[in-house]
From Swiss-Prot:
Family listed: Belongs to the DszC flavin monooxygenase family.
Name the UniProt record assigns to this protein: Dibenzothiophene monooxygenase
Organism: Mycolicibacterium goodii
Catalytic activity: dibenzothiophene + 2 FMNH2 + 2 O2 = dibenzothiophene 5,5-dioxide + 2 FMN + 2 H2O + 2 H(+); dibenzothiophene + FMNH2 + O2 = dibenzothiophene 5-oxide + FMN + H2O + H(+); dibenzothiophene 5-oxide + FMNH2 + O2 = dibenzothiophene 5,5-dioxide + FMN + H2O + H(+)
SUPFAM superfamilies: Acyl-CoA dehydrogenase C-terminal domain-like (SSF47203), Acyl-CoA dehydrogenase NM domain-like (SSF56645)
Highest taxon of source: Bacteria
Length: 415
């Protein structure tokens, strides 16, 4: 299929239900997910499936060529994808953060141009923000001012999910010493193919094996003035203002929660099928089928209750996020704070439920279910890996600080 064919197919599909489009894709991926997870590497074919589906522009407004879907719908798509393939759910969820950043921090011209191009060309986006230094905001990648008002980026980013194979890259750097505004953060959206950008094939981890979350190097990468999102430190100013521009943290945390809940739901449904068709009852149970074992039934009840509660909380938070998004510049710091408290709670519940379900499904499938051919371990490995992104204890503390002291979470990249 040519790029033109991909574009036409994607544009034609944007009049349907994006959730059903996601389900159709996952039915295709279901039969190969275990083998693909074992192999690791890049999810090139599956990413092209997503490109051709048109889902990459699910949150782009319709007048700019996208689906125009709301956040509850987009997050449901994340859950559907993650339910079958955690790595793809991870990649797609991270992809959604870039159109959001462009909308939140870009100029009107940048929003019009970049979001339209994203929709018309079915761009994948990647990110290059995290670094492996003394703390999470100890950034060493430099953004050296250029004479034309742009910058030259130099350094190495880590955990660059989706950078490899992407078309547009969201990157952050700091102005080095010796220049006005030294230490200020510069954000930019640049073509991944720009000279000097080098996404590396060096990602290794317990889980999320096919997310290409390795390093990305920047060798004197030229960033044009019209690719810079806002002025230096505009991001921190947006966080301090605690208005619409600070919604990046809530969006990312709810995306993460949706990935977790999708993976957990996938683990539950896959284990249920195994229990129904292959598991054996324990002799003292006095039953002939595993599905009649009272302890197995109880375990599934516990799994279902946890996910029922977490799903309900996540969907409520998604509605609140959409309401905050729609308020635009009228969003108050109080409304933003209340939203983040809700999402912090969702993140905590989703993390706990997903870790419990993905580790305990082995109790209801039995020893034979641990054979590598079934791949049940992938659910827990993916959850355990990604839930280490930012400590859930701090999300619980954010809720606790609000309940006890009526203090809202401090706006930032993760809150």
């Amino acid at each position: 299929m040519t790029l033109t064919d991909d574009t036409t197919t994607a544009q034609n599909s944007r009049h349907g239900d994006p959730i059903e489009v996601a389900r159709e894709l996952t039915r295709k991926w279901q039969t190969t997910v275990v083998e693909r997870d074992k192999a690791g590497g890049s999810a090139t074919e599956e990413r092209e499936d997503l490109r051709a589906s048109g889902l990459l522009s699910v949150t782009v407004p319709r007048h700019l060529g996208g689906w125009g879907a709301d956040w509850p719908t987009a997050l449901e798509v994340v859950r559907e994808i993650a339910k079958v393939d955690g790595s793809l759910g991870h990649l797609f969820g991270y992809h959604l953060s870039t159109p959001a950043v462009i909308d939140l921090w870009g100029s009107p011209e940048q929003k019009e141009r970049l979001l339209r191009q994203l929709a018309e060309n079915n761009w994948w986006t990647g990110n290059a923000s995290s670094e492996n230094n003394s703390h999470i905001l100890d950034w060493k990648v430099t953004a050296t001012p250029a004479d034309d008002g742009g910058y030259f980026f130099n350094g190495i980013k880590h955990f660059s999910s989706g950078a490899k194979g992407s078309d547009l890259l969201l990157v952050f750097g700091v102005i080095p010493e010796g220049f006005p505004q030294q230490g200020a953060i510069v954000a930019a959206a640049i073509p991944t193919t720009r000279e000097g950008v080098q996404p590396n094939d060096d990602w290794q981890a317990l889980g999320m094996r096919r997310t290409d979350s390795g390093t990305t190097e920047f060798h004197n990468v030229a960033v044009r003035p019209d690719e810079v999102l806002g002025k230096p430190n505009a991001i921190l100013e947006a966080f301090l203002a605690s208005g619409r521009g600070s919604l990046f943290g809530p969006i990312v945390q709810l995306v993460f929660s949706s990935v977790y809940l999708g993976i957990a739901r996938g683990a539950l449904e896959t284990a249920r099928e195994y229990t129904r068709t292959q598991a054996r009852p324990w002799t003292p149970a006095g039953v002939t089928q595993a599905v009649e074992d009272p302890y197995t039934i109880r375990s599934y009840g516990e799994f279902g209750i946890q996910l029922q509660a977490a799903d309900a909380a996540a969907r409520e938070a998604a509605q609140l996020l959409q309401a905050a998004w729609d308020k635009g510049d009228a969003l108050t710091s109080q409304e933003r704070g209340e939203l983040m408290v809700q999402i912090s709670g969702v993140k905590a519940i989703a993390t706990q439920a997903a870790l419990d379900v993905t580790s305990r499904i082995f109790e209801v499938i039995g020893a034979r279910g641990t054979h590598p051919k079934y791949g049940f371990d992938r659910f827990w490995r993916n959850i355990r890996t990604h839930t280490l992104h930012d400590p859930v204890s701090y999300k619980i503390a954010e809720v606790g600080n609000y309940v006890l002291n009526q203090r809202y979470p401090i706006p930032g990249f993760t809150s």
